[in-house]
């Protein structure tokens, strides 16, 4: 169970149909598509809140999580156990939309060409990775300080990706 979001999960019922039916049969374990749709909707809401824009959120079955500045892609399995860190991912990617300059890397790359710094593909990827790391910490810090209610989601994200928990 998610530590920071379990207070608003409804683990007893997942649909209006459940509310209308009064049978005593236990619900079979399995993928709850209604709950999954609710989780995706909630994650999309987090992106829209932190970015301040109506940003579409995509949920491929696998892959990386990222933003191109116009949409957010969350490439993680979503369930109640990992929901907190997935919300952390969504907040992180949404914060890039709100606070990142998506032209900055290209501008920095062009400046390095002016200085006659020979950029091989390897150096360019290293350079891009370093800029991304710094930018990630910067935008996370902005949201972390400005919205203390999201701290738990960020802690879950960092524990998953950086602290080995």
Regions flagged by a language model, labelled:
Residues 1-165:
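Basic/hydrophobic alpha-helical interface regions
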